[in-house]
């Protein structure tokens, strides 16, 4: 199981991530609103601006303050911030 740091010490299992997308478009904002009403939204931004939306295979949505490119690099590159168990 490989964990990836999505900011502020929060970790997500990398194999469960289906997509990493930018939150700026109107369809994504509606998607986030729907997830919030279903109680499937996890906010890991610590009050910062949301810069990436992670869609998990369980249907949960995770908000991160890191850029999508940063998270993708951590998943692919084996950054120091991630841990393997």
UniProtKB/Swiss-Prot annotation:
InterPro entries, alphabetized: RemA-like (IPR007169)
Family: Belongs to the RemA family.
Protein name (record): Putative regulatory protein DICTH_1339
Species name: Dictyoglomus thermophilum (strain ATCC 35947 / DSM 3960 / H-6-12)
């Amino acid at each position: 199981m490989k964990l990836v740091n999505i900011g502020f010490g929060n970790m997500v299992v990398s194999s469960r991530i289906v997509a990493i997308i930018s939150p700026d478009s109107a369809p994504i904002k509606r998607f986030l609103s729907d997830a919030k009403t279903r109680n499937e939204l996890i906010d890991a931004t610590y009050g910062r601006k949301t810069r990436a939306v992670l869609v998990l295979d369980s249907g949960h949505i995770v908000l991160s303050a890191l850029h999508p490119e940063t998270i993708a690099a951590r998943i692919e590159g084996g950054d120091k911030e991630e841990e393997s168990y």
